[in-house]
Amino acid sequence: MKTFNYNRAEIKAGIVHFGVGNFHRAHLEAYTNLLLEDPSQRCWGVFGAMIMPTDGVLFNALKKDDGIYQLTTCSPSGEQDSMLIGSLVELAWGEIDSEPIIAKIASEEIKIISLTITEGGYKVDFNQSRSVFWYCLLYTSDAADE
């Protein structure tokens, strides 16, 4: 298995990402992980902001392993390639405490705030005009005003 080729203690979060699900971890984190191998790019670690009530199991699993996880890709021919991803250097779950998320967003170190919205991750009630994600944004906004 391939592993990352950098010292995680040297990595600073420059990205806050909302929605640290499978899609995010298989794409943005994988590319960020490769970028961090360049010593001049050690300011692009990811702060994972988890805001959904259902994020608890994933949050606890990632937190237990300090944000490090294994990514396995499969080629059309069936070959598998696994690597350790270390770019997720900080993690917070808004259900427990939203303050670290708000503070990180306000930090001068943060240059990018990104989010993942997938059709299966945020349930839309077509009888209503708003999705669960919209309510999470309102919740986060209300928390910032307190």
Each model region followed by its residue ranges:
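Glycine-rich nucleotide/cofactor/substrate-binding loop typically near the N-terminus or early
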Residues: 46-111, 115-128
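Conserved small/polar residues in nucleotide/adenosyl-binding loops
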Residues: 139-146
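Glycine- and acidic
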Residues: 10-18
